[in-house]
Amino acid sequence: QAYSAMQNPVLKSSSTSGPVFAPRGDWLKAGELRRNPDLARTYRAIADQGRDAFYEGDIAREIARYSEENDGLITYEDLKRHEVEWQEPVAISYRGRTVYEAPPNSSGHVLLQELGIFEHFDPQEYGYMSSESIHLMVEAKKLAFADREAYLADPRYVDIPIEGMLDPAYLSERAQLIDVDNAAENVVEGNPWEYMSRRPDSRKKHREAGRLHKVGSDTTHFCVVDRWGNSVGELQSIQTAFGSCVIAGSTGILLNNRMTYWHLDPDHIDYLNPGQKVRHTMNPLMVFSAPVEQGGKLELVCGTPGADTQVQTNMQIVTGIFDYGLNVSEAIDGPRWTHVQAGMGSAYPHKDIESLQIEDRVGEDVMSGLQKLGHPIQSTGAWGGAGSEGAIQVDIKNHTFFAASDPRREGDALVW
């Protein structure tokens, strides 16, 4: 489906990608087989020789060769230096449960901020997917995205006040900015440094009190839970569909185009720097009955592709289950909204136009109510919302699992 929709001319014209995706100079038709024997050889080499085959062996050399011959920036030394980082997750308490997210440079904290702000409102006062509840969640999202735009980058290069951003008092302060009767037009970041136990590290770039201080949608998600409660949530992405649309020489590997998330303004917190990791939107999510160190049990693991929409879709799943009593399938199938915040989109050129995109299954009264609150509404039809959520819910009391996959995109859910 995505393949036929893209029809990217680079994918077709490239001397390495064209023979795979458009053999004979034309796109494959339904029922025809796509063959990529180079990629099969790459997989076999990794299976036989391990990670060094990719990062230090012939595969790395071929990627570097192709990059150099085509004016790319990837070198053999870049690949050789790569190391996986094991990091502690970030977490907040939400209505008596503990929600864990990926730490910076992931946008996982954005979802936690959204939930922490929304927690200051009583969901039972507003119906599920009512204009009032959607309004409150959208306004919480705006505040969290404003903080992301101001503070999130690679923590090795930028000092991020992450503890302050997740501090309950700070989230309460942010929640008080929400007008229940009107959509905010100009949302700015707060100052979470006031809620930190330390001052910013002067050796790193950081933003404080509105000032920047300087030193001198090709994503896949899956989640798994075994009978003992061990769980994995994984997201992998080469950015937009088919990434750069270019295969690296004879490796069969499509190169990504994640660098479109960089900002080229030196005064932006996520400004392009050598060796720095670009911030990203992938945020695998787990919800436990209590903190893990206190014996908390897994209740939900979920995730979705969708760039800036990920933390918004995940918010709707978590609130649907734990605020409105939906099961995991009902929460995923429910009407979905996505807010686009002017000037705060992750992808270059970062010039998005403000809109609230929503599936019209919410009903005309909800759409009308949101417009009256000041939201610029765009209908996405009945099932045209963003994301492709996959989730597993665990019933701790009865020791049963429930899995669901998003009907909006290709996906599957299995329990046995």
Segments from the language model and where they lie:
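Short, well-structured alpha-helical segments that form the helix of a local strand-helix-strand
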Residues: 1, 61-65, 128-145, 328-338
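Noncatalytic scaffold domains of N-terminal-nucleophile
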Residues: 1-50, 54-56, 60-106, 166, ...
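Internal maturation/activation junctions in enzymes
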Residues: 25, 120-238, 250-251, 258, ...
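Alpha/propeptide regions of enzymes that mature by internal proteolysis
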Residues: 33, 47-64, 68, 183-188, ...
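Active-site rim segments in enzyme catalytic domains, especially the processed small/beta chain
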Residues: 73-75, 225-300, 307, 311, ...
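Short, small/polar residue-rich loop motifs at catalytic or cofactor-binding pockets
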Residues: 86, 216-219, 280-282
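Short, well-ordered beta-strand elements
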Residues: 97-104, 111-115, 123, 222-224, ...
